[in-house]
Amino acid sequence: MLTKEYRGVASINGPLVVVDGVTDVGFDEMVEVITPDKHKRRGRVLQVSKNRAVIQVFEGTSGLATETTRVKFLRHPMEIALSRDILGRVFNGVGEPIDGGGEVYSNKKYNINGNAINPYSRQYPRNYIQTGVSAIDGLITLIRGQKLPIFSGNGLPHNQLAAQIARQARLGDDNEDFAVVFVAMGIKHDDANFFINSFEKSGVLQNVVVFLNLADDPAVERIIAPRIGLTAAEYLAFEEGMHILVIMTDMTNYCEALRELSSRREEVPSRKGYPGYLYSDLASLYERAGMIKGERGSITQLPILTMPNDDITHPVPDLTGYITEGQIVLKRDLYQRGVYPPINILPSLSRLMKDGIGEGFTREDHPNVSSQLYAAYSRVQEVKSLASVIGEDELSSLDQTYLKFGRVFEKRFLSQGREENRTIEQTLDLAWEVLSELPPTELDRISGEELEKYYRGSVNDNG
């Protein structure tokens, strides 16, 4: 395929280069930017308007001159070579190996932009992915093919939780091929080292593909990294027949990079300076999760984002919530009280949970136990509000029982060690131990048969 080369550029602004007088140039086309000293830098076409092309340069524009810089259009979008050999490898944000293991060789390259799965071709998500974290497995169950974000805040242990899930995640059926694609955007070097060391020491790295975009890497790579990670996931899922969990952190850094580029392009800003197309851009990533009829594999997404000032109405968590199928919310107050992971279950939910738990999936009592835990913990918050007005000593004995239940629930069920991996059976058994702090008359969401079988106290106890 013939390439076109142009000498001289119209303007340079941050990571963007504008070239005038171009013909037959396509959106997302890859570009070689040749510096005056003959070094090559990569770029891609961001915008085409009549005979003008706007190009984002991956390695930045430092040292470029408008008159002597040459631009070569390569006539193809950004692509990545993929094979099953990517498992166990570590790449940078543009898909280059950084683990010393050499290039990945393949007869075929894949367009990183991919496509959202056709709704008609989608298969409804079923079955669950066990994370080993009781709060998630028991109350906000992650379903195969789902997209379930984690809403965190600065200083909360979302990195530790992400690494723990990546280490512990498995399917209910061990006979299925399962792997994790881990994409990090704009993270610090010590966080990157933490993730790699965590995967290596636990022995799971051989079943993980890692893409790392560091805080001092070009911002434009932050926009590319999740697309490369999802392309790798699509290859493993739909060509190799594997079930893939994609963990992406931190989506707020991704959106900040998008805002920076939008500002450079002098686009009209929307809420808090983010581009007006933020919703559709996020959807182009999140909608690449799912299952396809007739295909064996699946892609499940667990995007993680930090909410500025813990504001859940901020555009990034707000728009993410519209696209995804629930959310897991971390709470600063729980973390300050020593609860790890500090998951606030009341605003958290998994919209697909009901279709992947219960008899035939987890255990027959799971739906009712989950519902009862939510109801009881909600009552705990009401009792705490009352106690703050009249004092604990003035509470009824039943209300004091609920306060005790709340303390036990947070200490024994929500809290667990960072290396502790609980099976779904252990999680449900622990849920019954906690619920048994309440008299059976208060467990109105659980059937009599389940009470007889699992309740740890006396079923005849009326409190």
Swiss-Prot record:
Alphabetical keyword list: ATP synthesis, Hydrogen ion transport, Ion transport, Transport
GO CC aspect terms: proton-transporting ATP synthase complex
CDD domains per record: ATP-synt_V_A-type_beta_C, ATP-synt_V_A-type_beta_N, V_A-ATPase_B
UniProt cross-references to InterPro entries, sorted A to Z: ATP-synt_VA_C, ATPase_a/bsu_AS, ATPase_F1/V1/A1_a/bsu_N, ATPase_F1/V1/A1_a/bsu_N_sf, ATPase_F1/V1/A1_a/bsu_nucl-bd, P-loop_NTPase, V-ATPase_su_B/beta
GO terms for biological process, alphabetical: proton motive force-driven plasma membrane ATP synthesis
Keyword Signal: no
Gene Ontology molecular functions: ATP binding; proton-transporting ATP synthase activity, rotational mechanism; proton-transporting ATPase activity, rotational mechanism
Keyword Methyltransferase in annotation: no
Family listed: Belongs to the ATPase alpha/beta chains family.
General function of this protein: Produces ATP from ADP in the presence of a proton gradient across the membrane. The V-type beta chain is a regulatory subunit.
Name of the protein in its database record: V-type ATP synthase beta chain
Gene expressing this chain: atpB
